[in-house]
Amino acid sequence: MKNSNSITITPDIVRQHGLTLEEFGRIGDLLGREPNFTELGIFSVMWSEHCSYKSSRYYLKKLPTTGPRVLQGPGENAGVVDIGDGVAAVFKIESHNHPSFIEPRQGAATGVGGILRDIFTMGARPIALMNSLRFGAPDHSRTRFLVNGVVDGISNYGNCTGVPTVGGEIYFDPCYNGNILVNVFCLGLIPSDKIFLGKASGVGNPVIYFGSKTGRDGIHGASMASSEFDESSEEKRPTVQVGDPFAEKLLIEACLELMKEDWVVGIQDMGAAGLTCSTFEMAGRAGTGIDLELSKVPMREAGMTPYETLLSESQERMLVVVSKGMEQNALALFDKWDLDAAVVGEVTDTPMVRIFDNGNPVVNLPVELVVDGALDLKRPTKKPEYLKEVNHVDLGLISEPARGEEILKKLLSSPNIANKHWVYEQFDHMVRLNTLGLPGSDAAVIRVKGSQKALALSVDCNSRYCYLDPFHGAQIAVAECVRNIACSGGDPIGLTNCLNFGNPENPEIMWQFEQAVSGMGEACTFFDIPVVSGNVSLYNETSGEAIYPTPTVAVVGLLEDRSFHTTQWFKEDGDLVALIGLTMEEFGGSEYWKIMCDRVEGKPPHLDLRLAQSVNKLCLELIQKKFIASAHDCSEGGLAVALAESCISHPIAPKGATLSIDSTVRNDAFLFGESQSRILISFSAKNKLAVEAKAKAMDVPFAVIGKVGGDSLVVDINGKEFIREEVSHLKELWFGALETYVG
């Protein structure tokens, strides 16, 4: 290989590598010498925000991460939660925002590939994917291109690897015009006593590279993901990785076969920072060192330097440590699966990673300095000035409407509320036959083979709420995920998060981050949900324009009996419809307010955590006692949209409903406001007394408001008709709107 270590390191070169001159000076002081060019590249990626979490670690320590079910919390490739019967759920959510904006198809595809590897690296077979996507305004010049590229990338990679994409969310807002968000979640199952960790243990044990060959794609991907965009962002296209889902499928099967052996010591995928990160992190977790010989690495391109080889983020690559003497067994297994593989190093008893190229030393660095040496930056925080302007709603902007049909139709046609079938029909959501029900209900539900159990999955964040109040906005994200799980018949058992924010060097952005993490931590503690894994994505801004704070959360819930699985749509004519929870006069951050006066203002809806918990517990108990037929949470678009969706989302036969509501707040607030902790349920009239008695016994606000039947949605408020619309027309609007924007 060519060697680039003769390059003289100047202040400009240091800054181009994303390090400050102070950080570079500290590296020299701790090393006792100036790093060479290849070593500079290693510090560049390992001390980047993407890998080191240097701006966020201080705050992340405040999240609850332990619990009786937690088998592995943050710090490994994914979190692991016990679900009983010797089985554990392995899950995580990750971002691939910057690459997906530059090259949407490959950026999104490799985001899927990376999160799959995080799961099967732990020894689990991936069984479900979800995604949380954010795009700019629907009429923005790049939105259609970006949406189509991202959806195609996700669907192609997931479909080819045979892992179903079972749910997710997609939102549009001008704040994402310059930075889209692509957050991907994956769930796997594993025997609870067969968890594999990313540790390079056992002095003298061989280190084996396997998977695809190494090329120049993705070099400095981690550093690129740790800086903001500007007008030259298109020039960063070469830093986007290129994925091969068929190679990933081979990798999955090879790894799961490998892990049946008792001589696998530790294993990790090569994700951000590639071979560099996997080598240093595996040594760091084990308290060992590694000697690595780069000439043994399978290469796709000739003439690559050690710098390029170490920083390449070519996809579908893994590093495994096996027991000494088992090298040939491992290599034979990889050959069977047609994967490139080679012994590239061994574990040492030094605290160093030493890297050679044809025997010539090119890197000699202390593991601890590289892995943990980046200082925790408790950056300054400042409450944003914009909040003084936006935290007020002038109710005089919109007079109380006399009729609600046109408003409801506008809401159902909004790309943020419209049915997402155009997206999920491109995904194979039934492969492996574990998915219970079609996408589109409150949570996806996946059966656990070999038992009666199932897992419910939900991902959520309302970034407008977080823009207006990041503390309560993050709490609402947690609460809605938990509510979605309850509506589907599950108990929440674990959470993973993806914290998407702007430039942390801006004190106002750090204030948003601090508030969001604090709010999330308080909500998780209250609901007794451990945060077992996650990801932080900073610098999501272009030319100084930051995205709204978007702390996305995904919650996994457990159904002890999959017969508890409940969906959102009305089932039978004559069933009664009831509302659980309280409605207040709240418009802040709502889709209604945005559509009617094109403003994002006010404060998020009030969230009473105790009421939220009571509402969830009542809903879950009614489901488990088989008292109710449907359950649907009220979120974007409020009660009116929840009612409409309950009427029209039935996959075969939409049903009408007639409602009569007594209200002490404005009509539009009751129907289109987004008061929290409300669930719409339907049930047979024969269960009315039992349902009412349970609500009264648990002291939860509850009211029967109508009945299922007919071919129209009819809503009377205080004795006056407010909405009358045929459900067939509502379904046509709701079902076809998204495709008109992005199809």
Language model regions located:
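Glycine/proline-enriched, intrinsically flexible loops and inter-domain linkers
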Residues: 1-743
